[in-house]
A protein has these predicted regions:
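Short loop/turn microsegments at loop-to-beta-strand junctions
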Residues: 9, 89, 129-130
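A short helix-loop-beta-strand connector motif used in the catalytic cores of GNAT acetyltransferases and
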Residues: 119-133
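Acyl-donor (CoA/ACP) binding surface of acyl/acetyltransferases
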Residues: 64-87, 91-96, 133-244
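Conserved RNA-binding domains used in RNP assembly and mRNA/RNA metabolism
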Residues: 1-64
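Conserved GNAT-fold acetyl-CoA-binding loop/helix
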Residues: 97-119
Length: 244
């Protein structure tokens, strides 16, 4: 198996033991100096893992694009800019209602918002990082992202926040619909998941309207500030989502 043709390409590897590895490949010729493994053959490294040629059952180059600009009927779904941090803090971070059902606020201060946005921007080199600002006629109305990509199940989780001033206009459904389509059809991710508290009717309605299906309910599965909610799990699998 000629591994050097995959050097510095994004690949998915299935080894002979059934393990899956996915990421940017760096290849090494036989005899490169990996004698610590006592194996003189070609190898490939993905993150901290070395896989030798004879252990590879299947290797495939995959095309991923990461966070690209999308458009829907009313929204521009774009990459973050550092200038967004202050607007996100003012629109989301200062509004306790935004985190009523999560208890987690990464924008609680201007400094936290700036650091979070900076981390998002720094992550754009990762082809499986997906983070967007939602813009309506030049005005920031919310954020959406997908995270925790799992190559074993070819799945990812999606989350969205709309600034309260813009609730009730269908923007969450519109953004979700565009992102779900992009992730399954363009990125070929088979399963996109999401979760919310049972009392979070707005999120539930947006996910259902975007085509996500309720697949599981965990009784008492979410506790926020001493309040216990059932946790609802949703999933979307686009027609083009399954990988070969």
């Amino acid at each position: 198996m000629e591994l050097n043709s995959f050097d510095h390409k994004y690949v998915r590897i299935l080894d002979i033991w059934g393990n899956t590895f996915e990421g940017l490949a760096v290849t090494f010729p036989a005899g490169y100096g990996l004698h610590v493994f006592d194996r003189d053959e070609e190898s490939i490294r993905i993150e901290d893992y070395y896989i030798f040629a004879s252990d590879i059952k299947e290797i495939k180059e995959i095309e991923v694009h990461g966070t690209v600009e999308l458009a829907s009927r009313w929204l521009t779904i774009r990459r973050y800019e550092q200038e967004d941090a202050k607007l996100i803090y003012e629109g989301l971070g200062r509004d306790e209602e935004m985190f009523r059902y999560t208890g987690w606020n990464p924008y609680a201060t201007v400094e936290m918002a700036e650091e979070t946005v900076r981390e998002f921007i720094d992550s754009y080199n990762d082809p499986h990082f997906y983070g967007w600002a939602l813009e309506l006629e030049g005005i920031l109305v919310g954020t959406i992202g997908a995270y925790d990509y799992d190559p074993e199940s070819n799945s990812i989780e999606v989350g969205i926040s709309i600034i309260r001033t813009f609730w009730g206009h269908g923007y969450a459904t519109e953004a979700l619909t565009a992102v779900l389509k992009y992730l399954t059809e363009n990125e070929k991710i088979a399963h996109v998941t999401a979760g919310c508290a049972s009392d979070n009717l707005g999120s539930r309605k947006a996910m259902e309207k975007a085509g996500m299906k309720l697949v599981r309910t965990e009784a008492g599965g979410l506790e926020v500030d001493g309040k216990v909610y059932d946790k609802l799990f949703f999933e979307y699998s686009g027609a083009e989502g399954e990988k070969e």
